[in-house]
Amino acid sequence: MIRVATAECFTHGFVAREIHAYSMGYPGGYSWSVDSDVVLVAGLFIPTLSGIRSILKFEPPEPSATLNDIKVYTEEEDERVALMMARSVRELTSADLGIGTTAGIGRGGIAVVSENREEVINSDVEADLRFSGAEEILMRQRSGIRCALELLESFLE
C-alpha cells in the first residue's frame, strides 16, 4: 500500500479527491493508467501564507504579491514552493509520497516527492491570479490536476 498526502493551492484539493476516489474503486474524471494499491493519508487545501506557516510548519519565501493572505508567486517561485509543500506534507503525515501544488503568475508548480525521488513540473496553461479571468484560472487548474495525477502515476509505476 502506497500512502499519499497532498498540500494543494491552485488545484483546490481536487488531486486529493481524485486519489481517494481511485483508491476506493470509483475514480472520478481522471482516466488512470496504472493499477496500484494507493491510500490518501490527507488532502490539504492551503492557499494562504498563514496556512503554510501554521499547518505545514515552514516559513515560505516572500511572494511577489498577496491577495488576502493568498500567496502569488512567479512560476519559478511556485516550483520552489510546491516542492517545499510536497516535502512538508509527506514528512508531517509519514506518507510515502507527498504532492504540492501552487500557482500565482505563470503555469504554476507541481511537485511529487518520495524518499529517494523528487520531480517538479508545470501545468500546460499560463495565467495570472491577479489579472486573468475565471476561465483562464480554471483552465490552469484543470491542467494542473491532470499534470499532477500523471506525475503521480510515474511514481506508482
Swiss-Prot record:
Organism superkingdom: Archaea
Family annotation (InterPro entries): HcgF
Recorded family membership: Belongs to the UPF0254 family.
Protein name: UPF0254 protein MTH_1148
The organism's taxonomic lineage, starting at the top: Archaea, Methanobacteriati, Methanobacteriota, Methanomada group, Methanobacteria
